[in-house]
Structures are given as C-alpha cells and as structure tokens.
Amino acid sequence: MSGTKLENLNVASQEPLITPEALKQELPLSGKAAETVENGRQAIYDIMDGKDHRLFVVVGPCSIHDVEAARDYAVKLKKLADEVSDTLLVVMRVYFEKPRTTVGWKGLINDPHLNDTFDIEQGLHIGRRLLLDISELGLPTATEALDPISPQYLQDTISWSAIGARTTESQTHREMSSGLSMAIGFKNGTDGSLDVAVNAMKSVSHPHSFLGIDQQGKVAIIRTRGNNYGHVVLRGGGGKPNYDSVSVALCEQALEKAKLRQSIMVDCSHANSSKDPAIQPLVLQDITHQILEGNQSIQGLMVESNLNWGNQSIPENLADLKYGVSVTDACIDWETTEKALRDMRDKLKDVLPKRRG
C-alpha cells in the first residue's frame, strides 16, 4: 500500500505561470499611468475623508470580454469624466473576473478567448495591457478582487477595488483586502444583509498574516498593516432593492453602531435594478434626490454601462458577437450613460460643495 497515490487525485494537470515581477517587467507602468493610479486613489481617499466634495462614480461594462470595445468605451468615458469632473470623480469599471453561482464564463483573465481554453497567462497579459492603456488616458480604473493571487499581477494599476456579495464573508478575501493599496468596497450579502459588509470593514482595518505569493511567484507569508478605507456597497438582495432613503438610513445606523465611517456607495445595478438596465438611471435619480434632500453618507455610485444596450450570450461562432454588448449582466448604453451622469452633475454641482464632510 505504500505506493498508493494520496494527493492530486482529481488534478488533471499543472503548469507554471509567469511571475508577477516578470509580467510587470514585460508591461511596466509608465510615469503617466502611475500618476493616474495614485491621483485616483488619493481622490477617493479625500472623498471618503470629507476633504473632496465630489461623488466617485465607478462606471463601465459588467465585464470586459473585448479589449477593443473597452478601449473605445474608455476614450468616450475620459471625455465625459473631464466634462463632469467638478462634481463627479469618474472611475472606469474594468472587471476581468466573474463570480459564478454554478458555472459559466469566469472572465477575461480565466478564459480570454471565450472558448474554454483557460489561457490564464495570456489573460493576465491582455488584462494588464488594457489597464495600462486606460491609465495612460488619465482615467482611473476599478475592479473586483475575486482571485486572491491576481492582485499581485494587477493591483499597481487599480485605483479602487470591490469585494463581491459572494465573497465579502470570506476570510481569504478579508485578509487580502487588508493588504490592498486602495479603498475597498464591500457589497452587502446576496440576501440583502448588511452584517457581512460591516464585519468585513472591521476585519480589514486590522493587520493580518496569511499565505500568498510574492513578486517572484514564491509562496510567502503575507503580513499586512490593515486597510482603513473599507466601505459598504449597497447592491440590494433577497429580491429587494436597498438604495431607498430608509435602507440608507438603516445602513448609517449599522455603521454608527459599529463605530465605522459612514461612507456608503450605491450599486445601481444587480438587485437594486432587478437586473433591468432601464432601472439604473432611475436609481441615479433617486440618489440625486436623496443628496438634494440632505443625505451626507452617500459618497459613491456604481453603474453598469457599455457602448450598446443589454446583453448577449456567448455564441459558438465568436464572429457573431455583437460589438460593445455585454456577455454577462445587461448594461445601459453609452447615450443613456452620458445623459444620466450629465443630469446628476447639473443637479448637484452647486449642492455638493456645501455638503458636510
């Protein structure tokens, strides 16, 4: 019996991956891109600290599957971001990893060719190159930190990160978040509960030690200082929205009870829109109204937006993909995005400077 194999019984294969250090040497961060990342992070810190009166708005596709469409979108968004910059800090949503309740396409890093070949190394190259290109435009980026290893490859290009509703309760993701170099938004649970996000904020503010990889790709003990810029993202749940003024007030109370900063972001999509993109602009209007009525705690917004409306399934023949249309959640189109953000800017431009920090 001594020759019996006892490990890797269900592992089909293993292959080495490029190290974070090597990827960064191949695709280095330029001075302009680094400035964009740093300025974006600091602006979000200042908004959360009450030093900057603006709202920060994370807007972009539900997920990235076509880098050319993403670049086209980024050029348009940069122009709009400059136009509304006195009132809104616009950050582009650049999501490469998609959590799955069961199975499905897991995102550009995991399967960049959309054909179940899982060319992860190519996915990391494609993803980092896109993030660098967007940063070169002067547009900060945001992503979801889903895989605890990929931040070592990409986090130097990111100004804001999210932890999703399915992973906010995960100890692994809380530990990772305590060491990330930017503000982190924790979504409430898929059932709508706030406790998981509030507890996550408490956890990540403290130092942690855990297993990870270093820049040379070696397994390492990671020791963190803690991250004091965690905040709640209200995304609805349990079949109900939670962006209304009563839900926001309940969130404020929960944060106050936990002695945490009252810094709230509202996700206009997911359960807050019943996954109907047409509802997202209505959520933006409601948040605008709450701020006009005196709300002080809402500091950020998230909008799922693409070049074109709706979504599509990934076809067997990838040539049949519609350009600029999401392959995951349905998004609002560019024209709707422009109108919604311009309307918000016009209504809040004279109000936000008078808002208390």
Question: Which sequence ranges carry the predicted segments?
Answer:
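Histidine-anchored nucleotide/phosphate-binding helix
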Residues: 70-83
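Conserved, mostly hydrophobic/aromatic
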Residues: 60, 266, 333
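Active-site or pore-adjacent capping/gating segments
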Residues: 292-357
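Active-site-facing alpha/beta catalytic cores
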Residues: 2-8, 74, 87-243, 247-248, ...
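N- or domain-start disorder-to-order transition segments that initiate the globular core
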Residues: 9-49
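Conserved phosphate/anionic-ligand binding catalytic regions in large, soluble enzymes, centered on
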Residues: 56-69, 329
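Gly-rich Lys/Arg/Thr-decorated short loops/hinges at beta-loop-alpha junctions or inter-strand turns
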Residues: 20-28, 224-238, 321, 325
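Domain-level signal for soluble alpha/beta catalytic cores
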Residues: 11-22, 29, 96-102, 107-121, ...
